[in-house]
Structure formats: C-alpha cells, structure tokens
C-alpha cells in the first residue's frame, strides 16, 4: 500500500472512530450526570432499567428518536432545521486537531491518535468549538419564539465577552511554550509533575475553566437556558432528533473541553511515574469532566448581570494582569 493510500485510510478510520466514540460518550455522559447529581442530592438516580440503570440510556435514545420532529409554522424553517446539525458538526470537527493519546506502532507504522497535527491546532480548536455557539444563536433566532430569541441573545453577549477571557488566558500559555501546536504544549510539560503548566499559570487555569463553562453552556454560568426565567431558552421549540443533535454537540464540546484542559495545564498524555500516559490522560480528563457535574450540583445559577459584571470588572482585568506578568517573565 502506498504512503498516500495508507494516510487516507488511516485518516478515514480515525474520523469514524472519533465520531463513534465521542457520540457514545456523549450519551453515557447523561447517565453519569444523572447518577452524580442524584448522589449529591441523596437520591439513587436511574436504577430500574437494566443493571445499575445502565439500559436507561438505550430507553432514552429510543424515546428521543421516536418523538415527532416539529418545525413551528412561523419559524425560519431552513435555518431552524440545520442549526442542530451545525452544532454537532462543529463539535466533532474541533476534535480533529486534538491529540488524544500517545503515539503507538501498528503494522510497523507509527500512528498518532490525532486526525490533523497542524501547527495552529490550538487556534483551530478554539475557533471551531466557538462556532458551535452560532448554531445555538441561529436556532434560537430562527425559532421565532420570545424565549428562544431571548436565550440566544443572552448567550451571544456572554460568549463574546468570555471568549476574551479564555483567549487572554491561552495567550499566556502560548507565550511560555512559543507554539500553537497542542503536541508542542504537551511535550513542554514532559519533564515531570512540576513542569505542568497549572503550576506556572494557575490564574490562566482558573480563567480558562470559567470561560469553558460559558462556552459549553453549563451551570452556574449558562445564560442560554434557564427554567425559571426563559424556559429552555434557544431549545424551547426543538424536539426529537433535532434536539438530540444539540445535545450531542453540547456534550461533545464538554468532553473536548476536558481533554483540552488536560493538554494545556495538566501534563497531557505524558507518563507519570510508572503510570502510562494514556491512563493519565483518561483519568485527568475524567476528573475535569466531573467538574461540570460538581458545579451544577453545588452552585446556584447566576443572574445575567452578575455573570457580565464578573467578566468585565474581575476576570478581564485579571487576565490582562496575568498576561503582563507572563510577558515580563518571558522577557526577563
């Protein structure tokens, strides 16, 4: 087999595996979230369908896929129909430049668990994952429903504001490493536990985590939907498989965000003592993913004015200060 044919086949297989695994993980994440929230609230959670309630996921999928797909008569039908698809596609595309695990050898060839190892991988991931929100905005706007439009508008304001916070935090990382490549950032932290960037950039870590909660529409910083204020927000008019596409896109973005935090701040897939790198990657990413559930159970939803004041009066000044300190450190 020629090198080009092997490369094309390898890339196709990687894409299929990523879509299959992350779509499945997005479904399993709902079961995990319900169990974790039940534990925090001293409940049992799903436990009736199958062992430990695991088959509940299959039952929910059957219910979701058999629901009627309703398109409101007064909506912008084409945009309303494609918005969920845009959300899922952008979430999966963002995974293309993320190195998942250490490289390994297969059939005498070195395989890198990444679809596209590009020099501007960090910029690519942030850009494509940010596009997921435009699907949310388009879906809310096209619904022609006051709750949907209000949720989309609130979300648009928050994402524009907090992307500045996340970007400033990432610029500090780029200044230290000197590269946009996620592989280079991972390798920068290969000298042991104290080479992890969380110790060199603790403030950037906190800022990026907060921005990530906004990016993935998670409590307590989610403004796009709130049962007590705007019902389901942008998703009020969605049902069936189209709502499921939004759901898959959101949870895929959450998983991608957890992996990205691990690569940027927690040593990535580098080995730790006698623990292989791939195990460390899974453990650290799972721990960060658990934070989504922990925060939802522990903190109340913030009001929109509180979220925006925190951004402009606290987080952006801190991000700029961190950037200045990092610049001085690099120069000196």
UniProtKB/Swiss-Prot annotation:
The answer, when asked if Secreted is one of the entry's keywords, is no
Segments passing through the bilayer: 4-24, 44-64, 78-98, 120-140, 165-185, 194-214, 255-275, 279-299, 312-332
Q: Name one GO cellular component term.
A: plasma membrane
* Cysteine pairs bridged by disulfides in the record: none
Subcellular location per UniProt equals: Cell inner membrane
Q: Which GO terms describe its molecular function?
A: NADH dehydrogenase activity; oxidoreductase activity, acting on NAD(P)H, quinone or similar compound as acceptor; quinone binding
Q: Which GO terms describe its biological process?
A: aerobic respiration
- Catalytic activity from the UniProt record: a quinone + NADH + 5 H(+)(in) = a quinol + NAD(+) + 4 H(+)(out)
Looking up InterPro entries in the UniProt record yields: NADH_UbQ_OxRdtase_su1/FPO, NADH_UbQ_OxRdtase_su1_CS
Stated EC number for the protein is 7.1.1.-
Instruction: Return the broad EC class.
Output: translocase
- A Pfam family of this chain: NADHdh
- Give the UniProt keywords, A-Z: Cell inner membrane, Cell membrane, Membrane, NAD, Quinone, Translocase, Transmembrane, Transmembrane helix, Ubiquinone
Q: Which domain of life is it from?
A: Bacteria
Membrane-protein topology: Multi-pass membrane protein
Q: What does this protein do?
A: NDH-1 shuttles electrons from NADH, via FMN and iron-sulfur (Fe-S) centers, to quinones in the respiratory chain. The immediate electron acceptor for the enzyme in this species is believed to be ubiquinone. Couples the redox reaction to proton translocation (for every two electrons transferred, four hydrogen ions are translocated across the cytoplasmic membrane), and thus conserves the redox energy in a proton gradient. This subunit may bind ubiquinone.
NCBIfam families reported for this sequence? PRK06076.1-2
Family designation:
Belongs to the complex I subunit 1 family.
Subunit structure, interactors included: NDH-1 is composed of 14 different subunits. Subunits NuoA, H, J, K, L, M, N constitute the membrane sector of the complex.
HAMAP family registered for this protein in UniProt:
NDH1_NuoH
Q: Provide the protein name.
A: NADH-quinone oxidoreductase subunit H
**From which source organism is this entry?**
Campylobacter jejuni subsp. jejuni serotype O:2 (strain ATCC 700819 / NCTC 11168)
Which gene is the coding source of this polypeptide chain?
Answer: nuoH
């Amino acid at each position: 087999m020629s090198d080009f044919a092997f490369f094309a086949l390898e890339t196709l297989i990687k894409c299929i595996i990523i879509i299959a695994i992350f779509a499945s993980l997005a479904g399993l994440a709902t079961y995990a979230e319900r169990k974790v929230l039940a534990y925090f609230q001293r409940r049992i959670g799903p436990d009736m369908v199958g062992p430990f309630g695991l088959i509940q996921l299959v039952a929910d999928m059957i219910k979701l896929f058999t629901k009627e797909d309703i398109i409101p008569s007064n909506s912008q039908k084409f945009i309303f129909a494609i918005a969920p698809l845009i959300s899922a596609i952008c979430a999966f595309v963002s995974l293309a430049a993320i190195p998942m695990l250490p490289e390994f050898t297969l059939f005498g060839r070195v395989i890198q668990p990444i679809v596209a190892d590009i020099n501007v991988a960090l910029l690519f991931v942030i850009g494509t994952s940010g596009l997921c929100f435009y699907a949310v905005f388009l879906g809310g706007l096209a619904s022609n429903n006051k709750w949907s439009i209000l949720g989309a508008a609130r979300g648009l304001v928050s994402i524009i504001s907090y992307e500045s916070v996340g970007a400033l935090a990432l610029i500090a990382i780029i200044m230290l490493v000197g590269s946009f490549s996620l592989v280079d950032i991972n390798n920068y932290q290969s000298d042991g536990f104290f080479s992890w960037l969380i110790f060199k950039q603790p403030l950037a870590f906190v800022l990026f985590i907060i921005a990530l909660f906004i990016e993935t529409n998670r409590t307590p910083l989610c403004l796009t939907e709130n049962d007590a204020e705007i019902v389901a927000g942008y998703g009020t008019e969605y049902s069936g498989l189209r709502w499921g596409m939004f759901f898959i896109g959101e949870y895929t973005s959450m998983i991608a965000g957890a992996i990205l935090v691990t690569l940027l701040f927690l040593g990535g897939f580098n080995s730790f003592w006698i623990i292989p790198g791939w195990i460390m990657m899974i453990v650290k990413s799972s721990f960060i993913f658990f934070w989504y559930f922990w925060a939802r159970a522990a903190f109340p939803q913030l009001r929109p004015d509180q979220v925006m004041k925190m951004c402009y009066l606290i987080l952006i000044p801190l991000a700029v200060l961190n950037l200045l300190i990092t610049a001085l450190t690099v120069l000196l």
